């Protein structure tokens, strides 16, 4: 797999050797606090920050024939197309930084890289018509400068199509596919193949994700206009139309009221609660192959790091007793921006299981992120994640007779929530 594209950002390991933890020499004044020695970061974050720095430097000295800063420009998707290249096959340290215990790429770090790349592209698209001072704040990409801000509004469903090996070169290809008046949708594809030319092969795409950013005036909070997009190729036009349809659907859902339960759904609600009441009222007679939803909960508190996936993975692991395998994360809406230094509380639980497929039972995990401010006694929900896992086949093969337990609700509120998620 080659990285010859002029818009390809190569990733290098951040340590010189497994025993040398001194970060590579560079101008630390150009990096935010989160990238100083001792702070958490992935190698991609460093590479992307360097790329952002070049964007901002070019804006400080615009060419004489540059259009006025207030003028909206029209760009093509190819103008924003950017590639991140991971030379796993030749960089041992980089491999170890991304390797999980099962010799695959750590999905949690990869999701962070996707978020960082999408944020960089959104800045590039928006800042082409601005030379304002800019500051980048990490996870959940709350990007802002003096007068305007870019916020991650939502992430569409992310599906892992095949395992991602840590021994084979990897790349992420991303570009803007749709622009509204104040919204940007960016599509990212994670590509991995033993072949060098993999761009045209659908089989090489391991994961696809779509990030939606919105531009806001920092003073008024109102929508801020952004550069227009003009798709050229048939594929670009198709992606634009599909994104436009998704945007219209999101608007329709936001404007809709909560539906009342129909008669058939009341029966489902009663069925979900029936077994849970036995656990509450007659625990000695309860089904040993089932468990109450509240008994699957885990919780973690930390200072703003992208750990929702890691907590979901841990929840699935402790629930199943075998190594879980990630399948997908559902659409995510970011209700509140999260800044570096914010105190986050992550709460997770197994919401429900799907046991109809014996060879591939499904574990549905909910992770709720709360932004907590003890000084003002405030706790707000930032966003809610829904992850889907199964059990690794090789782990299940080593445990004959393995069977996942059924998760049942104990309250009507829990039962309604499960039904809402099943219908989502």
Where on the chain are the PLM-derived regions?
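Short amphipathic
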Residues: 75, 79-91, 294-303
């Amino acid at each position: 797999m080659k990285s010859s594209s002029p818009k390809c950002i190569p990733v290098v390991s951040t340590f010189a050797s497994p025993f040398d933890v001194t970060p590579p020499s560079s101008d630390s004044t150009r990096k935010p606090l989160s990238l100083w020695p001792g702070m958490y970061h992935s190698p991609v974050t460093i590479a992307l920050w360097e790329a952002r720095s070049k964007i901002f430097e070019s804006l400080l000295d615009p060419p004489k024939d540059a259009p006025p800063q207030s003028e909206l420009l029209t760009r093509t998707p190819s103008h924003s197309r950017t590639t991140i290249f991971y030379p796993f096959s030749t960089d041992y340290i980089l491999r170890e930084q991304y390797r999980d215990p099962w010799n695959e790429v750590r999905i949690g770090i990869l999701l962070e890289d996707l978020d960082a790349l999408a944020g960089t592209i959104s800045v590039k698209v928006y800042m082409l018509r601005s030379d304002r001072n800019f500051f980048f704040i990490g996870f959940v990409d709350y990007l802002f400068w003096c007068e305007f801000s870019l916020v991650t509004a939502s992430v569409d469903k992310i599906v892992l199509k095949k395992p991602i090996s840590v021994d084979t070169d990897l790349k992420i290809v991303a570009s803007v596919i749709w622009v509204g008046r104040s919204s940007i949708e960016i599509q990212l594809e994670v590509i991995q193949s033993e072949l060098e030319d993999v761009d045209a092969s659908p089989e090489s795409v391991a994961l696809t994700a779509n990030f939606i950013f919105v531009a806001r005036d920092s003073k008024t909070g109102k929508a801020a206009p952004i550069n227009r997009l003009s798709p050229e190729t048939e594929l670009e036009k198709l992606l634009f139309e599909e994104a436009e349809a998704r945007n219209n659907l999101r608007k329709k859902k936001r404007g809709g009221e909560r539906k009342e339960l129909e008669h058939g759904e009341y029966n489902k609600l009663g069925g979900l609660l029936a077994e849970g009441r036995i656990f509450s009222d007659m625990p000695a007679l309860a089904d040993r192959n089932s468990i109450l939803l509240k008994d699957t909960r885990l919780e973690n508190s930390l200072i703003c790091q992208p750990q929702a996936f890691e907590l979901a993975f841990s929840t699935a692991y402790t629930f199943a007793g075998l190594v879980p395998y990630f399948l997908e994360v559902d659409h995510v809406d970011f209700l509140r921006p999260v800044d570096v230094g914010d105190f986050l509380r992550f709460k997770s639980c197994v919401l429900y299981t799907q046991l109809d497929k014996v060879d591939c039972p499904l574990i549905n995990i909910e992770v709720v992120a709360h932004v907590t401010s003890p000084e003002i006694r405030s706790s707000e929900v930032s966003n809610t994640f829904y992850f889907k896992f199964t059990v690794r086949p090789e782990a299940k093969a080593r445990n004959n007779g393995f069977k996942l337990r059924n998760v049942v609700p104990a309250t009507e509120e829990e039962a309604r929530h499960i039904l809402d998620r099943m219908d989502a």
